[in-house]
Amino acid sequence: MLSCVAMTMMGKMDKAEKIRFLCEDETRVGLKTISGRKITAKGVKPIGQVQWKFQATYIYGVVEPKTGENFFYEFSHLNSQCFEIFLELVSQHFADSILIIQLDNGRFHKAKKLKIPNNIILMFQPPHCPESNPIEQIWQYIKRGLRWKLPASLDELRLLITARLAVMTNDIIASIVGRTHILEALSVVDI
């Protein structure tokens, strides 16, 4: 018996030639200082300036473990309306492909009124295991580059995030998210 994903894919195959596997997630990035390790002499506690501003923005993203191709977009909220818009943007960005997208079980991912584009199939990962989604390491990589930064406004933060994303080539992203077990599974099914 075919799985629901396989049956859905068969119904959509005539519209596109390429099937892609992507990983999707969202992260909040704000003006509150991201602290982290600093190099100091042995026994010397690191000191750094911090700010406690509680303004934030959300970055939605998809990455392809096989190639490192990606798409990121900023939204002011984390909700089903923004997620629906994001899916439409992803659908247009990868218009020539059927997209199987792995994502978590967030409520807004399963909203009843959510309209999913025709070339997208959502594949929900098991609950309470974010480590199974490799895009989580992309967020860590981005935030590591924002440690101890003190942007004065959200616009300044956006510039820092844009600069961080600009240096992340497809090769860098593939090296972060290209887990062996995922790549082997994709090669078995010829994706």
Where do the language-model regions lie?
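RNase H-like polynucleotidyl transferase catalytic core
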Residues: 45-52, 118-137
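Mobile genetic element proteins and their domesticated derivatives, centered on retroelements
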Residues: 23-25, 61-62, 68, 87, ...
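Extended, low-complexity cationic-aromatic segments
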Residues: 2-84, 88, 184, 188
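Acidic/histidine-rich, metal-coordinating catalytic segments
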Residues: 97-109, 133
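Short beta-strand segments
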Residues: 22-24, 100-103, 123-126
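A structural signal for short coil/turn segments at secondary-structure junctions
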Residues: 16-17, 94-97, 118
